[in-house]
Regions:
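Short, flexible active-site-proximal loops enriched in glycine and acidic residues
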Residues: 82-92, 206-207
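Cytochrome P450 C-terminal beta-domain/meander region
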Residues: 132-146
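Short beta-strand-to-turn element immediately C-terminal to the catalytic PLP-Schiff-base lysine
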Residues: 100-103, 163-166, 172-175, 198-200, ...
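A short core secondary-structure module
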Residues: 125, 148-180
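N-terminal glycine-rich flavin-associated loop
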Residues: 87-106
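Alpha-helical interface subdomain recognition
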Residues: 1-82, 102-107, 114-119, 219-362
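Flexible, small-/acidic-enriched active-site or ligand-binding loops
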Residues: 133-136, 151-152, 175-209
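A short, Trp-centered hydrophobic/proline-enriched beta-strand micro-motif
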Residues: 117-129
Length: 362
């Protein structure tokens, strides 16, 4: 039985990659990360939403394309390969799914149509449910929320945020609320935005079907983890390709370094370890929609395993490049940092493996 991306999924992924090659080459990524040039980021985001990235998972009745998570995983892989400096996993995957699975009919009609028309953009922060840190605690009292949310993703130009408490209740807050303060967090990955949000008596719209029901938030987190895994696979593949290309050109001791057995073995090991990761993340994405009883475990396994494999690829790829691997001239560090940040978002490999063990009754 053949299991892989369909012709349509590959075509869409190729279009995303081509757009990024044309509109967001490495020099543009450098400019964005060095100058925090949001105008260029907005142009890139607008171009990708013109391709339909904002509407991938939205049901057709709300103006979306009605596609499945495997389609989104193919897109995420393409975005990772280009270290795309835009919001995707949070804004256009997790947020729509949170509303689809946790919102009332009225909330779906209100927000999903606006996501489809690109008139609202969500940042999302669920760290309180995944594993609260320090004093980052959100307390809901009626329709008011107080506290602090850490590691909110896709916050650039967000008009709204979806947050949660430690019980899994998700709620929407307006980014313009006078009691809400957004503090940008320092991160090694400058291609995306990570913030801390302070809330002081902020008005919250609770997603109706998430009260005393963890199904919606768990599905939202599962989807996010699969997207991050796919993004890392795309980034790691680029690092391997660059390593092989460099090994064929770089000469040392009168011969190309790719002729040395040690370098050959590093490239072969990276490829052998990464290749199965495609099937792992594709299967997890497929199960999300079609075998839901297995989806949560597979999301944990794909996120944890791929985080480890891509970390190894990032390390060995840098070693193949030698000292040049650390320079900005080649820009390898953008993919390195992307992989490193994906590894920690929505749960480290250790935390996610612990969740997988609990799911299996260990």
């Amino acid at each position: 039985m053949y299991f892989g991306l369909s012709e349509e999924q590959t075509f869409f992924q190729d279009n995303v990659k081509k757009f990024l090659d044309d509109q967001a080459p490495l020099d543009v990524i450098r400019q964005i990360t060095a100058e925090k040039n949001t105008s260029i980021q907005e142009e890139i985001r607008q171009g990708l939403t013109n391709l339909g990235l904002n509407a991938l998972l939205l049901p057709e009745e709300y103006g979306g394309l009605g596609l499945d998570l495997l389609f989104a995983a193919a897109v995420s892989e393409g975005l990772g390969s280009g270290v795309a400096p835009i919001a995707f996993s949070g804004s256009y995957v997790m947020a729509p799914l949170a509303i689809i699975h946790g919102g009332s009919d009225a909330q779906k009609e209100n927000y999903l149509t606006k996501i489809a028309s690109n008139t609202v953009k969500f940042g999302i922060g669920l760290s309180e449910y995944i594993g609260a840190r320090e004093d980052a605690k959100l307390i809901i009292n009626g329709n008011k929320v107080n506290g602090k949310a850490l590691f909110v993703i896709d916050a650039d130009d967000a008009s709204h945020f979806i947050l949660s408490d430690d019980q899994g209740t998700m709620f929407i807050v307006d980014a313009d609320d006078s009691g809400l303060e957004v503090i940008e967090l320092t991160s090694v990955d400058k291609t995306r935005s990570y913030v801390e949000i302070l809330l002081n008596n902020v008005t919250a719209e609770i997603l109706d079907n998430t009260v005393k029901n963890n199904n919606a938030i768990e599905k939202t987190i599962d989807a996010g983890r699969i997207m991050l895994a796919a993004d890392s696979v795309g980034a790691a593949q680029v690092m391997i390709d660059k390593s092989v290309e460099y090994a064929k050109e770089r000469k040392q001791f009168g011969r190309v370094i790719g002729s040395f057995q040690a370098v050959k073995h590093m490239c072969a090991e990276m490829t052998a370890e990464l290749e199965p990761c495609y099937a792992i993340v594709w299967h997890a994405a497929h199960c999300f929609d079609y075998i839901p009883e297995e989806a949560r475990l597979l999301a944990c396994q794909s996120k944890s395993h791929i985080s480890e494999v891509t970390k190894m690829v990032a390390k060995k790829s840098t070693e193949v490049h030698g000292g040049m691997g650390f320079t900005d001239l080649l820009g390898l560090h953008y993919w390195f940092k992307r992989i490193g940040m994906n590894r920690q978002l929505l749960g480290s490999p250790e935390l996610v493996r612990d969740e997988a063990g609990k799911i299996q009754g260990f």
